[in-house]
Amino acid sequence: MPKSTRSPWSTDIRWVREALISPSFLKWFLLSILLLASTAQADRDQREKWTLNLYVENDLFSETDQDYTSGIRLTWVSPDISNYVDSEALPGWVRRINRGLTFFHGSHKGLKRNVIVSIGQQIYTPQDLNQTMLIDDDRPYAGWLFMGFGFQTRAPEQLDTLELRIGVVGPAAFGREAQDFIHDLRGFDKFLGWDNQLRNEPGFVAVWEHKWKRTRGVTGSRFGMDAIGHAGLALGNVRSHLNTGAEFRAGWSIPDDFGTSAIRPGGENSTPDSVWDPRFTGNRKWGLHTFVSFDLRLVGQDIFLDGNTFKKSHEVTRESVVADVAIGISYIYGGARLSYAHIFRTREFSQQDHSHSYGSMAFSYTF
């Protein structure tokens, strides 16, 4: 018999061709297309969501009233945008401000971008509330009222934040009035030495911070863990420092973001990053996790310890290295997130009797 000239692969090719046109394959192919389309639509929908954050920090949680005694900040985070100047997702007044801050925009293309606008206040006091005279061996009274503009650029597992905070230190920051209001409300004794506070001075601080993330089993509702590192720097007459640190989280439905936010510059990192985040599922999904974090700073300037920049004022001997350690818990339900952290801070100046601690409460809503 003549030898067959048919290719040894012809049977396999015919089988593949028949499989590709079979009804079962077409059915699964169409289902896959629909699934991809729905995921893409969900991705587009989540990019249109805004995030509003409220932070309240106070040493009342530690039953003290001294050093960094109170802080509050309200932050508004935009949806993902293509650029900071032309995006119609941003109000006109924000785009106009952004045109003057192009240095902070960065040059990377095709990444997720967000604009952050914030307003806040921080208050610092010495330990002795009854002393009306200047206390030489304790920190100055000071208030800091500020507005911030930040720009975030996100890649998978990475976040870069550039933020500029501008405001005023001194009586114009209304630190005394804010503290007196709260103390009257709660029936606490007032601090009597506010006449010795730092003088009025315009303040600014520019911050860059880079974060990177390593995850394990954090998607869906499973138990998971992740680790988030950060490093950055701050320059300004209010603060100048180098910093580095990390956060470790473990729990159920850990949010797909870059950790637990704080009032410190560059600390805004809780914006949802993908459709897998519990706040984007649309079915009131819940999540619960605990976290431990630390931040180590090499401090070159701190107006709240070094005193006024251009005028003679009270000052203390600042420590060059300061560390924060925080432990806390965070709960998510639907688009809302509530977190509490207790922060332990090492001594900030040599005359300080002991380390300081305070509580930080954060409420975030994505809508």
What residue ranges belong to the model's regions?
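Sequence/structural signature of outer-membrane beta-barrel proteins
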Residues: E57-F61, Y124-D128, V169-A173, K213-G217, ...
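Short loop/turn motifs that connect adjacent beta-strands in outer-membrane beta-barrel proteins
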Residues: D43-K49, D80-R113, R154-T161, R214-A227, ...
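Residues that define the transmembrane beta-barrel architecture of outer-membrane proteins
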Residues: Q66-I72, Y141-L145, D160, N200-A206, ...
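Extracellular loop and loop/strand-boundary signature of outer-membrane beta-barrel proteins
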Residues: T132-D137, F191-N196, G232, K311-E315, ...
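Outer membrane beta-barrel transmembrane domains
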Residues: T51, Q127-D128, E247, S253-F367
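Transmembrane beta-barrel strands of outer-membrane/channel proteins
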Residues: L52-N58, V115-I123, L164-G170, H210, ...
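Short glycine/proline- and aromatic-enriched beta-strand/turn motifs that initiate or cap beta-hairpins
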Residues: D43-S82, N114-L129, R297-L305, V321
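Long, hydrophobic/aromatic-enriched structural stretches that serve as scaffold segments
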Residues: I97-G175
